[in-house]
Amino acid sequence: MASLLCCGPKLAACGIVLSAWGVIMLIMLGIFFNVHSAVLIEDVPFTEKDFENGPQNIYNLYEQVSYNCFIAASLYLLLGGFSFCQVRLNKRKEYMVR
């Protein structure tokens, strides 16, 4: 039977920690972009043309960046799930008799 174990216990634990931090940070950033935080205007990819038609174009760009943050957070969540599975497989491997 083929094993799905491909990471050691330390790498898997590191993956869980980094994934948890990435999910928390990106969800918070997504929320702040979604409420159109003025502090984050430097991180919105706008051009001079976007300022001509009022704030609606800028708000749409804020929401697009917000969606990108939520998508990245979901990818970090998947990576955290994979790392958790690797931790479980490593613990199971310790108790198996060879």
Swiss-Prot record:
Presence of the UniProt keyword Isomerase in the record: no
A GO cellular-component term linked to this record: vacuolar proton-transporting V-type ATPase, V0 domain
Enzyme class: hydrolase
Localization per Swiss-Prot or TrEMBL: Endomembrane system; Cytoplasmic vesicle, Clathrin-coated vesicle membrane
Tissue: Expressed in brain (at protein level).
Molecular function as annotated in GO: RNA endonuclease activity
Membrane association type: Multi-pass membrane protein
Keyword annotations of the record: Cytoplasmic vesicle, Endocytosis, Endonuclease, Hydrogen ion transport, Hydrolase, Ion transport, Membrane, Nuclease, Transmembrane, Transmembrane helix, Transport
Principal subcellular localization: membrane
GO biological process: endosomal lumen acidification; pH reduction; proton transmembrane transport; receptor-mediated endocytosis; receptor-mediated endocytosis of virus by host cell
Parts of the chain that traverse the membrane: 13-33, 65-85
InterPro entries (UniProt xref): Ribonucl_Kappa (IPR056552), RNase_K (IPR026770)
Pfam family name, one: V-ATPase_su_f
EC number in record: 3.1.-.-
Family of the protein in this entry: Belongs to the RNase K family.
Record text on subunit structure and interactions: Interacts with the proton translocation complex V0 of the V-ATPase. Interacts with ATP6AP1.
Purpose of the protein: Endoribonuclease which preferentially cleaves ApU and ApG phosphodiester bonds. Hydrolyzes UpU bonds at a lower rate. Regulates the activity of vacuolar (H+)-ATPase (V-ATPase) which is responsible for acidifying and maintaining the pH of intracellular compartments. Required at an early stage of receptor-mediated endocytosis.
Name this protein carries in UniProt: Ribonuclease kappa
Organism listed in the record: Bos taurus (Bovine)
Gene name of this polypeptide: RNASEK
